[in-house]
Structure formats: C-alpha cells, structure tokens
Amino acid sequence: MGKATYTVTVTNNSNGVSVDYETETPMTLLVPEVAAEVIKDLVNTVRSYDTENEHDVCGW
C-alpha cells in the first residue's frame, strides 16, 4: 500500500484550466512561506494558459 497524498488544486473558472500540487506532507502547507510559494506557482501556471483574458484570472 502506497503513501497517502494530498492535493491542492487551482482552477481558472473562465476557461477550465486546472493545475494540481501533490504532497505527502500536508503539514508543511501550514508554514505561510511554503503555502504562499505553492499557491503562487499554481496561479502562475494557470495564468500561463490564459493569454487573452488575463483579467479573468487571479493576479499575483
């Protein structure tokens, strides 16, 4: 039996693009700097798929 993984997902509702971050240690996300970096990376990845309607995506 494998280790449990936990997933953080960011989705752009205007175009349906979704990106995930998986971790086996969700407690690390309680560290504000770590959580901010994870979310920033996810948002930037989602944003890279939206070239025409940038105002529809959460800016960072």
From Swiss-Prot:
Coiled coil: none annotated. InterPro entries: YoaG (IPR015051), YoaG_sf (IPR036489). It holds the Pfam family DUF1869. It comes from the Bacteria. Homodimer. This is Protein YoaG. It comes from Escherichia coli (strain K12). The lineage of its organism: Bacteria, Pseudomonadati, Pseudomonadota, Gammaproteobacteria, Enterobacterales.
